[in-house]
Amino acid sequence: MGNANTKESRGDDSGRRGLHSALDAGIGSSTQSGRESSRRNRNTRHDLTGLLGRAAGGSSSHADERHERKETKQEREARRLEKERVARLQERERSMKEEHVDGGYLVTMGTYVGPEDFNKQIVRQLMIERKLAPFWRGLNDFDENWTEPQIIAAARGLPIPAAGETPPDELIPRPRSPASPTDASSNTNHLTVPIGGRSLSTASEHSTSNAGSALPSPGSGKGSSSPFKPTRGKAIAAVLGGGSCRNGSSTEIAPREIMLPNDPFVNGQPLEVFLYKNATECPICFLTYPPYLNHTRCCDQPICSECFVQIKRPDPHFPEGHNENDPNNNPEESAGLLVSEPACCPYCTQPDFGVTYEPPPFRRGLTYAISPLALGSTSAAMSSESSVNSGSLSPGVASPGGRRRNQSLSANAPNVVLTDKVRPEWATKLQAARAHLARRAAAATALHTAAFLMNNNESRALRSRFGRRNTGGSGSASATPGNGDENRGTGPATPANAGATANTDRAAGSSGNGNRRSRLEDLEEMMFAEAIRLSLAAEEERKKKAEKEEQKEAKKREKEREKAEKKAEKAAAKAAAKQGGPYEASRSGHSSASGSSLSLPGLSFGRKRGNSAASNLRVEASVASAMASTGAAMTTPAAPGALAPDSSTKDKGKAVDRSAGAASNDASARPIPSPQPMAGPSHLRQMSSASSASSSAVESNQGSYVPPSNLQDPRGSGLSLGGRSGVSEDGDEQDRDPSTSTEPMFNFRSLAEVVGVSIEGEHAGKRLSQINADGQAIEGEDETAKSGEGAGEHVEHVLDSQTTGISEQDSEINSQPPRLTVTLDSPATSVGDVSTASDSKHVGNETTVEHATQVTL
């Protein structure tokens, strides 16, 4: 189409360039030969430019070209596209001025600005054959009330004049003047050109249905001897033979194009008015065209040629999302090859999109030449004037206003033009894409194969260091895998076994018949061994990760448990503090008998109901019975569900050291502590020196101290009277008061011997002088009962509430006051082996006691 002129000019330029190069080469060769002859006598090196046939000044030009920057591929492609665009614009302008088909054009009008990748030569041939509508000029606006000059201006792309304005001369068509019959006869003699015995193509035979309109008018104003004016693309089509395969014969060339006489009228109307007076709109681009448009073969919908040539097959792609249950499914799709489906109709989406065209009832512009045989078989020739006055049309052409067809046409119909016909290179593109994909797959396979082979060779080299070499014998070759298995051990050695088996097969084949295993089998074995190795490695990695996760979870659970225990201890301490009141706030969680009234002076907490010396004497005298009961409590385990007395019900101060959460083995196992001097001032009055436990501690006999190993001895004293008021529930040593001590202070055996009281056996707590005096003991018990009723408030329980698991006998002993109760009225008993200096310090001696005023806290 438009590339013919460019190719011709390019050919001329190449011819000139070849001539100049030949002349330059000749001049250069002659000059160089002179130089060579002049230099032969000097025995110098021949100039290489003479051997290469270069000119004298060519060296400098090529030296300059070396320093020029090379053009990249992108720049070269952009330059090529720009050249094609400029050439296309020039060709469009030339074709629109010189060529047309029935008032339409053979080049696009610029509706779509994208690349024109359709075959322009095929489209040109189809339009000249009247199988495809020409590229009509589309109108953006059209008014049915336009006058003829306005329609002509719009069809030619000129400014539309006003309705009442006088149109310019160029918009007024002028009929041709009648010519002489001699001119007509002379033109008739030159109608045909000898074709040389070749047969016309089928397309050309179909295009001669209206042969009468192809005759030149007698009034032709051309001065040429022949009415036929060959176009520039005719020679190219004849030489290249591009239409040979498309016309059904491999030996034919494209038919010769001829230009019909220029007649600006059709049935007495201007050509533009005849075309655009009944204009229609394209449903795709929404431009107004003449009613002679293409119609789809399936649904008979109008479509312009510019929209039709833009519809094409999709690019080659993988068959994803296609209907696999379709019985017409292509087997190539199941093979995973690239596919390219035919284009579908834009209206009804039916595949194999194609169009048909019904040309207008006249012929103007280009057409193909006809043979004399075809011309003789047609009817008598009609002139253009007779065709203007004639109301009958050619028999083979249907009127566009006729009845529309109500059924679709086959894709193989002769008058159907498919999208694949204007783009015949789709099959080539598909094959190229498949070949490119195959090359990429082959390259990837080669890379993977090389990687597997390298890994396999390295693994075999490593195994050969530890195994026995194969010397070629079948016995040694068969013995090698066994040795290798023994060296490898009992681990998962399946990949090594596979490699050893392959090695054995190769050795046996090379020593025997020389048959080797195929490359595909080796590759499969290597892939199998690699897969097993990767699987084992993945399993080991998974186990390591699982072990790490388990360790993390265990540490996390341990931390959470410790936090929960600390929170529970804090909550229990807070609850005990709230339940016991202000006197319970400083108590330790390890409460025991050390919180009894014996430890009140040292611990500095609790309530003391009796402040008199008599109450102190009672407490001091009841030590023996308390020790006996403590020993029983140590041997008998405490009940786990022992309940402490409620502080709300017993609010008289008798349950000083009883807490709800103090049921522990440590509390029951500890002996009763002895009192110590108070750490600070107290509101209580000073106790008597005769009844004070502190004075006994100062003047106790030498050697009465019991080491820590005798702490659990019921005959020894308990813990020190130093309070554990500041000790936390967990019993940390750092929270303990350093002024206090847990070492025993007294030996109650030596104290009892000095005092004269028995602390063992059935008569524990009795004086030695009163053991045989039953009456005096009974009388002492009566007095104790009477004094217990009156002064019961001064008796403090020694055992804690956690010793609820003690037997009934021990509980009865603990609930009753001791058998020997020393009161203010009891007479002092003299002991013979006791010095007078220490009599005043022992229990039972007369002592002047100052009665202190009782203070209630």
Swiss-Prot record:
It comes from Neurospora crassa (strain ATCC 24698 / 74-OR23-1A / CBS 708.71 / DSM 1257 / FGSC 987). This is Protein sip-5. May negatively regulate the snf-1 kinase. Residues 1-81, 157-231, 384-416, 466-517, 545-747, 763-857 are annotated as: Disordered. The keyword Transport does not apply. Residues 49-61, 209-230, 384-394, 476-504, 586-604, 621-645, 688-697 have a biased composition (Low complexity). Belongs to the SIP5 family. One of its GO terms (cellular component) is cytoplasm. InterPro entries: Sip5/DA2 (IPR039301). Disulfide bonds: none annotated. It is found in: Cytoplasm. Keywords: Cytoplasm. The keyword Cell cycle does not apply. Residues 179-191, 199-208, 698-712, 800-838, 845-857 have a biased composition (Polar residues). The lineage of its organism: Eukaryota, Fungi, Dikarya, Ascomycota, Pezizomycotina. Residues 7-16, 36-48, 62-81, 545-572, 648-657, 783-799 have a biased composition (Basic and acidic residues). Its main location: cytoplasm.
